[in-house]
């Protein structure tokens, strides 16, 4: 019977050559590179940056309330000029105000007229209303920036986790490929032994079943790996089917334990929640002060022309006579405007904003409670994951030894194929466990960094 070890040696050499060729042909991307790609290219993060730019424009808009308003108007009309003593109400804000002498009869002969006005209105005292609006706009900028930083941090955590899961899946594909190679050797050797009459026919059937099972495991591992590649490339902002990642030092070292547990009060999600509280409070103050009056300095100048002479009351219906200015005026003054009945609306709006402040405070407390739990859970997970990762090499060594013994006994005819197949399954499970526990140790470290809100706790261990 052919030696199993000779078959393994040939397969090992061919797979090694194939692996080296594949590694040299594919350019691999590091974790730092894909983190930067995700930061620059992911569309949702770009939307948060646009939100910041919008908030910056709103604060510029709020600051324009410090400036005086200048309104210029120029108009040309064709109308009659009958008038009467008495008052009238405007028509939805438009006051139709004919100007002329009071006569006993109406004259329906229209003439052209012109009017040009310039009005400057400067709210020099507003009792803090403009300042409150500016502070609310600044608080909204801080909220938008905190929102972006939180989304960026959460996105980077997703990228790192997807990177680690892809590395695990890659290793699982390698493990299942090795398992398939072993199953193929068993099948070839067993078929030869059965054909020569050295082994019973049932061994050939068992070997075929184990080979089919190994192929199924490899196909499932390959499927999971391809799905994870797509997921990671999506997080980078560019979908790629064959993204290649660098294993870096994830499978040459285990993460080291930290002496003290990191805090979580600087977590970006808490910072964002606090910014929401501050922004809501600033809006409530702006609403409260909107009831206060304003004191304005006013200056105006205007000129008017008419087809009716201001000297002889003579009518001229030509356009040129109507648009030529006949009189000029100016005005300077100070005024106060205060809508006293507006207090009812402002009071309810202020209460609504106060409830919003209370809402964001409770959201902050909820997130604080969750992060406290996540921090403690991450500590526990990290310690257990490290312990598991240190034990799996022992498991793998024992499984390899058991496989070698079962292989030798099978070749000597001292045991059956079923016992050898069991040792192969145990060895495959040990290889898979080694890769999974190693990856889970790094993922547990990532969980600690995510709870603390500081990704450098993870990245610093890669240097």
Where are these regions (language model features)?
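A short glycine-centered flexible hinge/capping loop motif at secondary-structure junctions
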Residues: 194-198, 410-414, 451
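Bacterial Sec-pathway N-terminal export signals of envelope proteins
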Residues: 24-75, 81, 239-283, 339-340, ...
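Sec/SRP-type N-terminal targeting helices
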Residues: 46-50, 63-64, 108-110, 124-152, ...
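Short flexible linkers and secondary-structure junctions
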Residues: 27-162
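Periplasmic alpha-helical coiled-coil/stalk elements that build and connect Gram-negative outer-membrane
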Residues: 3, 151-266, 385, 427
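Acidic, low-complexity, intrinsically disordered peripheral segments
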Residues: 71, 80, 433-463
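Small/polar, glycine/serine/threonine/aspartate-rich low-complexity segments that form flexible
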Residues: 73-119, 249-253, 298-338, 342, ...
């Amino acid at each position: 019977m052919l030696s199993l070890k000779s078959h393994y040696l040939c397969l090992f050499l061919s797979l090694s050559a194939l692996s080296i060729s594949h590694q040299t042909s594919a350019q691999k991307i590091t974790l730092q590179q894909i983190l930067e790609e995700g930061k620059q290219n992911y569309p949702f993060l770009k939307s948060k940056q646009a939100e910041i730019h919008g908030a910056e424009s709103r604060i510029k808009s709020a600051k324009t309330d410090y400036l005086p308003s200048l309104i210029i108007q120029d108009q040309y009309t064709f109308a009659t000029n009958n008038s009467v003593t008495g008052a009238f109400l405007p028509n939805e804000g438009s006051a139709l105000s004919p100007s002329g002498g009071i006569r006993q009869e109406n004259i329906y002969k229209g003439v052209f007229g012109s009017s040009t006005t310039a009005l400057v209105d400067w709210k020099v005292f507003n009792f803090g209303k403009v300042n409150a609006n500016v502070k609310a706009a600044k608080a909204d900028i801080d909220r938008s920036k905190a929102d972006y930083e939180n989304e960026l941090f959460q996105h980077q955590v997703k990228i790192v986790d997807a990177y680690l899961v892809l590395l695990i899946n890659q290793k699982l594909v390698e493990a299942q490929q090795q398992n398939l190679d072993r199953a193929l050797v068993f099948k070839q050797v067993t078929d030869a032994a059965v054909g020569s009459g050295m082994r019973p026919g049932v061994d050939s059937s068992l070997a075929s079943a184990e080979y089919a099972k190994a192929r199924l495991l490899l196909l499932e591992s390959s499927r999971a790996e391809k799905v994870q590649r797509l997921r990671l490339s999506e997080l980078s902002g560019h979908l790629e089917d064959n993204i290649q990642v660098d294993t870096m030092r994830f499978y040459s070292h285990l993460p080291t334990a930290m002496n003290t547990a990191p805090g979580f009060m600087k977590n970006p999600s808490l910072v964002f929640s606090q910014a929401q509280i501050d922004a809501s409070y600033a809006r409530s103050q702006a609403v409260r002060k909107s009831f206060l009056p304003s004191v304005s300095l006013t200056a105006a100048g205007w000129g008017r022309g008419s087809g009716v002479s201001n000297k002889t009351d003579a009518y001229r219906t030509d356009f040129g006579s109507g648009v030529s200015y006949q009189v000029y005026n100016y005005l300077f003054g100070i005024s106060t405007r205060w809508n006293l009945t507006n207090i009812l609306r402002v009071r309810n709006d202020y209460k609504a904003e106060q409830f919003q402040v209370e809402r964001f405070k409770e959201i902050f407390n909820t997130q604080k409670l969750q992060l406290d739990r996540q921090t403690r859970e991450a500590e526990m997970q990290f310690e257990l994951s490290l312990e598991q990762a240190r034990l799996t090499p022992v498991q793998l060594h024992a499984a390899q030894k058991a496989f070698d013994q079962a292989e030798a006994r099978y070749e000597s005819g001292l045991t059956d194929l079923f016992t050898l197949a069991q040792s192969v399954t145990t060895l495959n499970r040990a290889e898979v466990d080694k890769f999974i526990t190693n990856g889970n140790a790094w993922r547990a470290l990532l969980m600690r960094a995510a709870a603390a809100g500081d990704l450098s706790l993870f990245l610093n261990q890669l240097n």
